[in-house]
Amino acid sequence: MSILQERHKKLAFYGVPSTGTAGYVLTRMKFFTKLTTNKNPIEHNVKYVDEASQRNDVVGYNTSIDYGFDDYANDQVLADIAQIHNEELTGDQAKRSILLVDTYTGKAILRDYSVIPGTSGDDVNVYTYSGSFKSCGEITKGTVTTSDNYATVTFTADT
């Protein structure tokens, strides 16, 4: 029997900077009202003179994740993204690792992203932020383990 996959079981974790050996702690991304992945394929299109149709091939990806969140105090992930917005950080100061986890299979994909600020304060009831995470590197496939019910995870890359 097929199982409908629920959105809340596809989790995202953000690399909050730390002084540990990895340089970050993968912390669950909570309070997000939007986390939409865009694959943005890079295409090679060619039309040969002896063929009626054009050929299209995907030659790469420029993956991005559009985000939006309600700003909650005392949340490390939200505070870090808000700091990038508010202080207009650039370059490596605005790069973070994001891990996407499928709790149905235990599979995970880790990738570095640049935090691209968009808007802030566009709701009259609560303070909000939105923008995009844009890929800056290849994906690393693997699995995760957790000892705190997915508040944080440890990623192990496939070999």
Q: Predicted regions: what is each one?
A:
Residues M1-G68, V115-Y127:
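Solvent-exposed edge beta-strands and adjacent loop segments
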Residues V16-T19, D70-Y72, L100-K107:
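Short, flexible beta-strand-to-coil junctions
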Residues K30, D70-D71, F133-G137:
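Secondary-structure transition/turn motif
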Residues T63-I84:
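Ordered, amphipathic secondary-structure segments that act as subunit-interaction surfaces
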Residues V77-I109:
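Short, acidic/charged, Gly/Pro-enriched secondary-structure junctions
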Residues A79-E88, D112-S114, Y129-S130, S147-D148:
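"Short basic amphipathic alpha-helical interaction patches in structured regions
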Residues L99-I139:
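Short beta-strand and beta-hairpin "edge-sheet" elements
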Residues T143-T159:
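Intrinsically disordered, low-complexity terminal/linker regions enriched in Pro/Ser/Gly
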